[in-house]
């Protein structure tokens, strides 16, 4: 009798409020994606294919934040249909750049952007997926690091915990031999409080880190803010520094409120 082919785990990729950049990072994996594709069944990935296989799903990758009542309901359905759920990118893990609405009045923004704002159904805030459902792992970045994404997928296939660095961008600067832009040039930089993963691209080109990978674990933002003050950075400038792609992530949110 012919042996049965082992059933491949189902992978689903979901989009909420986002720019699709993190999904494109998955497609950009190229050779690595081809190897992984042979070990999983890509059941739902509208960025790559219109073909959809019904759940339940073994692993769901979720990009984007929750900004509408409909999406708040939809994410609960995705969670119910998924054995494991991993959020990918700043939008899904912290609310994204669109979370700047959380610090103002959303109706004022709508009146500026849309000719008929009364037709727009939206929530007053943009929130991370973890504020609505249980998340098994968060992969940060804007966009995500594709090597880290491959590590997460490989870890899932092997039944182990992903090995993703929890260090700061400062460590990445040291590893690539980049001179500290804040110490040497007095350039404001969020590197000491930002999660590693970008490869310290901005400091390598003499620009301060602007926190696209979000706050690292136990980030000492209060200490950094004091140093920024020494450098002559105003309260308004400090607030703008913390309020970018991960404005709604703690402790960036709290520290920006103190500025």
Tell me what each language-model feature is.
Residues 86-88:
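Active-site neighborhood of phospho(di)ester-bond hydrolases with catalytic His/Asp-centered motifs
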Residues 1-61, 71-72, 76-84, 107-259:
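Iron-sulfur (Fe-S) cluster-binding modules
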Residues 98-100, 152:
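Short secondary-structure transition/capping segments
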Residues 64-66, 90:
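Short glycine-/small-residue-rich Rossmann-like dinucleotide-binding loops
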Residues 102-106:
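Short, hinge-like loop/turn segments at secondary-structure boundaries
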Residues 91-96:
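Short gly/pro/ser/thr-enriched loop/turn and capping motifs at secondary-structure boundaries
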């Amino acid at each position: 009798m012919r042996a049965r082919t082992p059933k491949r785990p189902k992978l689903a990729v979901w989009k909420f409020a986002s720019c699709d950049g993190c999904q494109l990072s998955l497609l950009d994996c190229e050779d690595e994606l081809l190897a992984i594709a042979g070990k999983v069944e890509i059941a739902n990935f509208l960025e790559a294919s219109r073909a959809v296989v019904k759940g339940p799903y073994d692993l769901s990758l979720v990009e984007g934040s929750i900004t509408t009542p409909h999406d708040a309901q939809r994410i609960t359905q995705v969670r119910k249909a998924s054995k494991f759920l991993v959020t990918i990118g700043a939008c899904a893990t912290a609310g994204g750049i669109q979370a700047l609405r959380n610090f103002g009045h959303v109706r004022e923004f709508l009146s500026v952007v849309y000719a008929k704002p009364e037709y727009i159904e939206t929530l007053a805030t943009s929130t991370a997926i973890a504020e609505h459902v249980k998340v098994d792992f968060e992969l940060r970045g804007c966009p995500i690091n594709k090597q880290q994404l491959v590590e997460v997928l490989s870890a899932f296939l092997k039944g182990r915990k992903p090995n993703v660095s929890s260090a700061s961008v400062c460590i990445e600067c040291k590893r690539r031999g980049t001179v500290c832009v804040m110490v040497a040039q007095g350039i404001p930089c969020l590197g000491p409080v930002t999660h590693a993963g970008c490869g310290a691209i901005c400091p390598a080109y003499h620009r301060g880190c602007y926190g696209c990978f979000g706050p690292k674990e136990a980030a000492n933002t209060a200490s950094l803010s004091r140093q920024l003050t020494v450098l002559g950075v105003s309260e308004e400038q400090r607030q703008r520094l913390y309020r970018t792609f991960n404005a709604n992530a703690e402790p960036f949110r709290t520290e920006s409120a103190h500025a």
